[in-house]
Amino acid sequence: MKWFLLMLIICNAVPLQGLTKIVSARPQVVNIGSVFTFNSLIGKVIKVAMDAAVEDVNASPSILNTTTLRIIMHDTKYNGFMSIMEPLQFMESETVAIIGPQRSTTARVVAHVATELKIPILSFSATDPTMSPLQFPFFIRTSQNDLFQMAAIADIVQFYGWREVVAIYGDDDYGRNGVAALGDRLSEKRCRISYKAALPPAPTRENITDLLIKVALSESRIIVVHASFIWGLELFNVARNLGMMSTGYVWIATNWLSTIIDTDSPLPLDTINNIQGVITLRLHTPNSIMKQNFVQRWHNLTHVGLSTYALYAYDTVWLLAQAIDDFFKKGGNVSFSKNPIISELGGGNLHLDALKVFDGGKIFLESILQVDRIGLTGRMKFTSDRNLVNPAFDVLNVIGTGYTTIGYWFNHSGLSVMPADEMENTSFSGQKLHSVVWPGHSIKIPRGWVFSNNGRHLRIGVPNRYRFEEVVSVKSNGMITGFCVDVFIAAINLLPYAVPFELVAFGNGHDNPSNSELVRLITTGVYDAGVGDITIITERTKMADFTQPYVESGLVVVAPVRKLGSSAMAFLRPFTPQMWLIAAASFLIVGAVIWCLEHKHNDEFRGPPRRQVITTFWFSFSTLFFSHRETTTSNLGRIVLIIWLFVVLIINSSYTASLTSILTVHQLSSPIKGIETLQTNHDPIGYPQGSFVRDYLIHELNIHVSRLVPLRSPEEYDKALRDGPGKGGVAAVVDERAYIELFLSNRCEFGIVGQEFTKNGWGFAFPRNSPLAVDVSAAILQLSENGDMQRIRDKWLLRKACSLQGAEIEVDRLELKSFWGLFVVCGVACVLALAVYTVLMIRQFGQQCPEEAEGSIRRRSSPSARIHSFLSFVKEKEEDAKARSSRERQLEDISANGSSRCN
């Protein structure tokens, strides 16, 4: 009997396996669990906010009807284990949802259990960007993902032109995943994290000090702090003691700092001094009447400051209330059952079999995700990836006892000085921020980078060349001098910080080393930079960063030249023979055309044949000087003459200019006219050993490698050019203009032929993304502006008078191809004028001599007779033809009248 009574008690106390407890569709009370640390920075505001939200929900007649919403709050007391166990206790009771946990680390664990039990977990403080809905379908983040906060920081870094940052974070999932997201966003902006400085989750002051000392020794001065509320302020205190809150530093804190300022304001004076000039972010909540009313109400609820977490906590409760209401409207029931898998395992001492599955969990989850309402924080609506719509942040600058808003960040438009509601009424004009007061009370934008003060000297690779010691020279005692070295030293001396370096020769001094290989060694860390005659070409820019060019030097061709002496026939030199022939023929042709057009009615073009020939020749060649005395009377003749005089003007001007140059400028001649000549012939071509010129000639100009001859020094240039192709030398040498000018300074028998056919420059090479390249570029520009660059150039590269003579090459003779367009226009005009004139003559011939034309046709049917009659008409003077025609008509009239009388 006792055992029977005991079994009854157990049966009443514990529901049988598989038994389901069903509550009515509209229960009197719906329970929601909430776990957080009451005394934490976030906890002391969200408790007040959720109590206010529950009160407002239960007082509202438009939601839940007769059902009362109840939130059961459990204090985790800063204990990670309790943060996990408390939600599990809620899952043993009839709780439809849980708000929390507070930290991302514990939220990840609880979300696994919630997925099995189909109980939604809502958190506005667990912002770990790696918690995806695919892995945790029942985890819902009701604030903004940290992914957007890191995107905002990346935009700030790019806005100020910085390239590298240091990231300080807690060594847990929240810190590591947040910094990983920051690295991804920075890489999209072509920036990067140069140093990831991790601290233990609960660091000591000694831990912080050791880490900040390492940060101070790094090059980047842009420091992003993704910290915890617990040790974030302590970090700034240590940084100030180490002098790291001074001018030149940039500190960017995630929204943990703005939360502290909003919640605990006013902060102690010492704390405020520690964070002066820091930039921090805060979740943006648009202004509204609802928000203003809540802010006024908040001061009556608590003395604690209002942070954005309180606003999101309030909206989260309302979001759940609306979702519960929609859940009931869909016919949902609050019912729980045991998980068969857990039941099979057995509860044991852990009582796991007490965990219950929310039967309507999936439907309730859909109701939550479909909520679309306007709350204190703005629009509460989820996207397809379960992030809230319209992510935005305020960008704050800590100044004085508080902060000032220097701008906003929006996911769709980036940085702006206007909030979203004002941007809708204005045109977007790029990313902007207001001015910032930086650490050290500086308003100048920090450079963001300093030379690393780690005591190591930079290894600067300098090519040890066998040629042109004026450019770079390595002495026997190891001293390195030259134009390039002096420019580099002068630029380094202009930097606002010390850069210790040592020059290291690259090459054996006998064979010219490859500058491309020197640049490659910079990428591998053998050298920290490259200084010398390093030409900036595409291949090298893919491996390293280059400074502003300090020498403009393209490729040119140098070849043997001979001086052209004076000649009695120098006046024929401006035109090629073909040009002279065509010009002379054009004079004769135009004269003949003018004679044809003017002969019939212009007495100046009539007379004996001998006179007409002389007149035609005289008229043709007198147009060369615009001194022709014969006038043209026909319109066609005038048109042809105007066009011809324009052609003569162009030819005459070109001839005069070319002849002037020939007679006044020292002339040199060479069979090589430029790079085009070298491409068409098969002569050997010299190039500097170890230079990029070889690859350029082969790959860009398609010159066969067998034609290329490497030359090491100016002496080898000289010998190869003097020997020529016939004696084992070269027809020409292709090299950069800077070298050729040095080569020609004392060799007048050679000269530059043709035009410079590439545009390149020399620059200093640095590793990719090296801020030193930017600073040295600015220093090079400063050298150019203050005249120091020219003084260094004059010291090493000053050319002698002979180099100017060597650069003077024969003026190209004017060819027909330069004027063929003019001759074509003139020729077309002549042909058209003759065609029109012929048509007019045929028409006049038919009108003035119809009887003669018909009679001649009847009498003489041969074509030659008809042509002879027409030519006679054309040759006849126009007045004589008209008079003859008039007499013939009179005779015809008289004859006609006599015949009528006889009749």
Swiss-Prot record:
Keywords associated with the record: Glycoprotein, Ion channel, Ion transport, Ligand-gated ion channel, Membrane, Receptor, Signal, Transmembrane, Transmembrane helix, Transport
Broad class of where this protein is predominantly found: membrane
Annotated TM spans: 577-597, 607-627, 639-659, 822-842
Comp. bias (Basic and acidic residues): 881-892
Glycosylation (residues): 65, 207, 300, 333, 411, 425
Tissue: Expressed predominantly in roots and siliques.
Cleavable signal peptide: 1-25
Disruption phenotype: Reduced wound-activated surface potential changes (WASP) duration in the systemic leaves, resulting in a decreased induction of the regulators of jasmonate-signaling. Glr3.3 and glr3.6 double mutant has no detectable changes in surface potential in systemic leaves and the induction of the regulators of jasmonate-signaling is more strongly decreased.
Region of interest (Disordered), residue spans: 881-903
KW Transmembrane (keyword) present: yes
Topological domains annotated Extracellular: 26-576, 660-821
One cellular component term from this protein's GO annotations in UniProt: plasma membrane
Compartment(s): Membrane
Disulphide-bridged cysteine pairs: none
Topological type in the membrane: Multi-pass membrane protein
One Gene Ontology term of the molecular function aspect: glutamate receptor activity
GO biological process: calcium ion transport; calcium-mediated signaling; cell-cell signaling; cellular response to amino acid stimulus; induced systemic resistance, jasmonic acid mediated signaling pathway; response to wounding
InterPro entries linked: ANF_lig-bd_rcpt, GABAb_receptor_plant_PBP1, Ionotropic_Glu_rcpt, Iontro_rcpt_C, Iontropic_Glu_rcpt_pln, Peripla_BP_I, Solute-binding_3/MltF_N
Cytoplasmic face residues: 598-606, 628-638, 843-903
One Pfam family of this chain: SBP_bac_3
Family (UniProt): Belongs to the glutamate-gated ion channel (TC 1.A.10.1) family.
Assembly behavior: May form heteromers.
Function: Glutamate-gated receptor that probably acts as a non-selective cation channel. Mediates leaf-to-leaf wound signaling. May be involved in light-signal transduction and calcium homeostasis via the regulation of calcium influx into cells.
Descriptive protein name: Glutamate receptor 3.6
Taxonomic classification: Eukaryota, Viridiplantae, Streptophyta, Embryophyta, Tracheophyta
Name of encoding gene: GLR3.6
